[in-house]
Amino acid sequence: MQIEHCRVNHLANPLGFAMEKQVFSWVVEDAKGKYQKEARILVKVGGSIAADTGWKNLDSVAATVELTLKPRTRYAWTVAVRTDAGEEAVSEENWFETGLDTWQAKWIGCDDSKPRHPVFTKRIEPGREVSSARLYICGLGLYEARWNGEKIGNEYLAPFCNNYNDWIQYQTYDVTQQLNAAGALSVELGNGWYKGRFGPDRKQKPHYGDSWKLLAQVHIAYTDGSEEIIGTDESWKVTRSSIFFSNIYDGECRDDTLPEVAPVKAIPVEAPKGTLSERYSTPVTVRQALPVKEILHTPAGAEYDGNLPLACEGTEGNADSSAIRRNSPGRQFLPGQSAHRQSGVHLHFRWSPPCAGAEVYLLWLPVCEGAGHFPFERRGFY
């Protein structure tokens, strides 16, 4: 007998999610008995017992535990089950970790009159051996965080689609491995649902706010028991990326021929209107990478969002435009979405003829498959 699919609030090992109420669930597999007779949930913090239900008739779909949670704390838990046939098994150890309670960081921004999207950076040099490190972050409209240029986590489109006038969710990332050495934390912002247009209106007016904003706080716990907190403030620097246009409907435009922009100090900005909270939305991740096997025809229509891989050869200054043309044979058009441009543009920046090879770029492109063919390779879906 085995106990599998252990979840808290239907999430496997959730990090930084809102936990006003904790609901535990599990599945018993390969049991000889016909039903679960009784179960016991044990919750620990750092090896000490925080809650113990004892053996009782617990609901395997929605069991609750009397537990007062502390912020920034990891709770380990197991569930033991007995069946009517006298079998007994204990699950593997699972966990959930609570979010931040007090923010020392400030909301920061930049000159919003410039179209090139901002990249905020901070040099971090841990002074001792790191035991654990967490990044608590929210960037508006959208953000992607990187450590020494490498993406942190596997999520996209954070902080997702919600009513920013009412609430704004921040995300938590385990950055222990990254902060074992000195490096640069960088955060690139896009327009997203907050700052970009929202709906079929062609006008590029912001829906919730018109300014890029960033709030980030790094907590470092050292092996000697000390802690260090690094938050966004005026000491952070801001430069510009090669992306000068982005939209959840229209994709993005990137020009790698643009000159580098010297970093300047970030500026303090007002907090957004909505209440900041732990995350509720589950991660948006790449679910599949599919090779081309056949051309599909979907009379009913379907919609995909994803990255279009572009292998390109060209000369400096030439532009590649990958577009889904509307309402033409063999192309894609989704009725009712006529305001969606559905194109991605990239400017070459490093090749001159003859070109010995090609490089692949991933362009964010909302791909709409209507009543027609699907002529290009599908690599990832969100």
Regions found by a protein language model. Give the residues of each.
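Extracellular/oxidizing-compartment recognition motifs
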Residues: M1-Y382
